[in-house]
Amino acid sequence: MKCDPSIAKLINNELSRQETHLELIASENFASKAVMEAQGSVLTNKYAEGLPNKRYYGGCEYIDGIEQLAIDRAKNLFGANWANVQPHSGAQANFAVFLSLLKPGDTIMGMDLSHGGHLTHGSPVNVSGKWFKTCHYEVDKKTEMLDMDAIRKKAIENQPKLIICGFSAYPRKIDFKAFRSIADEVNAYLLADIAHIAGLVASGLHPSPIPYCDVVTTTTHKTLRGPRGGLILSKDEEIGKKLDKAVFPGTQGGPLEHVIAAKAVAFQEASAPEFKIYSQKVISNAQVLSNQLQKRGISIVSKGTDNHIVLLDLRSIGMTGKVADQLVSDIKITANKNTVPFDPESPFVTSGLRLGSAALTTRGFNEQAFEDVGNIIADRLLNPNDEDIKENSINKVSELCNKFPLYSENI
């Protein structure tokens, strides 16, 4: 990037940060070189409004082939009858669903944000909470898991037009079949937002929502390890036609075909047997991390995990998420403060710290390494004012980063 040394320097600095820090943000992962090559290709030059073979621009004969390949691979990977690969993000995918299935003022029901839901599931600060009436279900106070009987009662009381099952900070499996039964009882559409667990679903390590849900949305990064983007799936091709129109021209203009090509590459990677092995390690590594932190006296929401998410409840050690976030950041561990169920703190402070295993598993971290990471985090959080432990932790992080390099060749 000789033409722009300022940007080149910042990109190199970011690469160095990724290489020298432990990435534990649950929504992040490391894309392959092949994915990045596709996204950084000449496809960024091409406008292609419309769908394959139904474009509003000329010169799309190769673009059509790329997008159709992405569609076919997505359908095969998830066992869907229909797919749209154009959404720029998971939020855009959800907006398209709302536009196609709802009218302003309809009621939607999703998981409460402070209990692990997402902004686009009816939060008052999001369009989903401004255009629609909302009601939210929570986790059980004792188990910190979903209580399907309580969710059923909430649905009957509020009669939502759309029920959303999905999360951004819930470490347990979702019973899509039970959600389907509730949706049928109140005559509601059922949307599964699997942004966090898409890679685990694709690998067969989490139950699939496709047989039970009217629509499924996801991002294409996180556990799926592709480019940052969105995807919509359905078993119902008639609903799919509505969704196509809701994506374009309903909520977006021209698709990002260079990103769609990168999605196609990621779908191909996720269909390989090696990806299932990777996904199994994502789960087992998260469980090792969860177990080690609990051994050190740090509470974990729901007392464990079935996926890549480990959510620390720091009330057990008298600490806020904001403080913990800074403490681990000081030793080159990247995480994020997060609310926990029935959190007394504000979203800007929180009582939780959210961790995820996907990115470090991509680097090759094994169970022993994750046990080490758990001890490093516990040492720091339990001894926040000990400078010797802080310096020792920084050295241990550096040793792990050198042992498990991010990219084995220049990018």
Swiss-Prot record:
The UniProt similarity line reads: Belongs to the SHMT family.
Site features described as Plays an important role in substrate specificity, chain residue numbers: H221
Q: In which pathway is this protein known to take part? A: One-carbon metabolism; tetrahydrofolate interconversion; Amino-acid biosynthesis; glycine biosynthesis; glycine from L-serine: step 1/1
Q: Which residues carry this modification: N6-(pyridoxal phosphate)lysine?
A: K222
Where in or outside the cell?
Answer: Cytoplasm
Q: Which reaction does it catalyse?
A: (6R)-5,10-methylene-5,6,7,8-tetrahydrofolate + glycine + H2O = (6S)-5,6,7,8-tetrahydrofolate + L-serine
What are the protein's GO molecular function terms? glycine hydroxymethyltransferase activity; pyridoxal phosphate binding
Gene Ontology annotations for the cellular component aspect, listed alphabetically? cytosol
What is this protein for, i.e. what is its function?
Answer: Catalyzes the reversible interconversion of serine and glycine with tetrahydrofolate (THF) serving as the one-carbon carrier. This reaction serves as the major source of one-carbon groups required for the biosynthesis of purines, thymidylate, methionine, and other important biomolecules. Also exhibits THF-independent aldolase activity toward beta-hydroxyamino acids, producing glycine and aldehydes, via a retro-aldol mechanism.
Q: What is its EC number?
A: 2.1.2.1
Q: Answer whether the UniProt record assigns the keyword Lipoprotein to this protein.
A: no
Per its UniProt record, what CDD domains does this chain match? Answer: SHMT
Tell me which stretches of the chain form a coiled coil.
none
Question: What InterPro entries does the annotation carry?
Answer: PyrdxlP-dep_Trfase, PyrdxlP-dep_Trfase_major, PyrdxlP-dep_Trfase_small, Ser_HO-MeTrfase, Ser_HO-MeTrfase-like, Ser_HO-MeTrfase_PLP_BS, SHMT-like_dom
What is said about its interaction partners and assembly? Homodimer.
Where is (6S)-5,6,7,8-tetrahydrofolate bound in this sequence?
L113, G117, H118, L119, E238, S346, P347, F348
Q: What is this protein called?
A: Serine hydroxymethyltransferase
Supply one GO BP term. Answer: tetrahydrofolate interconversion
Q: Which UniProt keywords apply?
A: Amino-acid biosynthesis, Cytoplasm, One-carbon metabolism, Pyridoxal phosphate, Transferase
> Main EC class of this protein?
transferase
Q: Does the keyword Nucleotide-binding apply?
A: no
Cofactors demanded by this protein = pyridoxal 5'-phosphate
